[in-house]
Swiss-Prot record:
<dbReference type="Pfam" id="PF00643">
    <property type="entry name" value="zf-B_box"/>
</dbReference>
<dbReference type="InterPro" id="IPR000315">
    <property type="entry name" value="Znf_B-box"/>
</dbReference>
<keyword id="KW-0963">Cytoplasm</keyword>
<dbReference type="GO" id="GO:0005737">
    <property type="term" value="C:cytoplasm"/>
</dbReference>
<feature type="zinc finger region" description="RING-type">
    <location>
        <begin position="15"/>
        <end position="59"/>
    </location>
</feature>
<keyword id="KW-0175">Coiled coil</keyword>
<protein>
    <recommendedName>
        <fullName>Tripartite motif-containing protein 12A</fullName>
    </recommendedName>
</protein>
<dbReference type="InterPro" id="IPR050143">
    <property type="entry name" value="TRIM/RBCC"/>
</dbReference>
<keyword id="KW-0863">Zinc-finger</keyword>
<feature type="binding site">
    <location>
        <position position="118"/>
    </location>
    <ligand>
        <name>Zn(2+)</name>
    </ligand>
</feature>
<keyword id="KW-0479">Metal-binding</keyword>
<dbReference type="InterPro" id="IPR013083">
    <property type="entry name" value="Znf_RING/FYVE/PHD"/>
</dbReference>
<feature type="binding site">
    <location>
        <position position="124"/>
    </location>
    <ligand>
        <name>Zn(2+)</name>
    </ligand>
</feature>
<dbReference type="InterPro" id="IPR001841">
    <property type="entry name" value="Znf_RING"/>
</dbReference>
<feature type="coiled-coil region">
    <location>
        <begin position="130"/>
        <end position="234"/>
    </location>
</feature>
<keyword id="KW-0862">Zinc</keyword>
<comment type="similarity">
    <text>Belongs to the TRIM/RBCC family.</text>
</comment>
Amino acid sequence: MASQFMKNLKEEVTCPVCLNLMVKPVSADCGHTFCQGCITLYFESIKCDKKVFICPVCRISYQFSNLRPNRNVANIVERLKMFKPSPEEEQKVFNCARHGKKLQLFCRKDMMAICWLCERSQEHRGHKTALIEEVAQEYKEQLQVVLQRLMADKKKFENWKDDLQKDRTYWENQIQKDVQNVRSEFKRMRDIMDSEEKKELQKLRQEKEDILNNLAESESEHAQQSKLLEDFISDVEHQLQCSDIEILQVRLQDVPGSESQKAWKPLPFLSAAVVFLVMTVSSS
């Protein structure tokens, strides 16, 4: 509160020409007060009638010689100088490189800060100017609009980030579920395949056992039939060594359908002629 009061009071005793605390303040007939040096330099720069002067604030004409010292303002300025401003309140002062005066105006055409002497020079005469504070305030308002837009964009980006994080979490969980489902499905299929494999292997083992048993029986029968065949061959060879009378006598003694003939079975790989011959000899 006190800081705002001091600021307002300082504005009341600030020269409208140099925008600094007034030095040797003088007041015109219109009531506006200026630094004696600033208003004198301004009066000389505009090269007007030496008797008539136009106030740079309200543009009212008055006699330059009617300027009078303002002791009240001077006393206030002296008291303000006793108060040391805080670092936050202190601002760096920028002066005109050409005239050494404070840069308190802004030329809108040339887009540059100027002093009040620059405004009256040939370079900037007739250009639209405004106080730096006013232009700065305009820029601050524009920057505020930009800042609001940027903050809105920032909010959108934060929401976007949240959405991305939600999507990441969703897809991580979804893919994890899919991985579990795939593993479960393939395990089920492997269990089925393992069961089928066991069944098929059991069938093959049983088939092998049956085949081997059949082969064993065939081998046993083969051995028996081979023995009988060898016996028949031996008998035939023996009969061939006998005389005709003995051969006929042996034949008469053999009765068809004897046990030896019933026991012998022709093997499937013997030709029909051999089987016929063996049977004939056996029955002779």
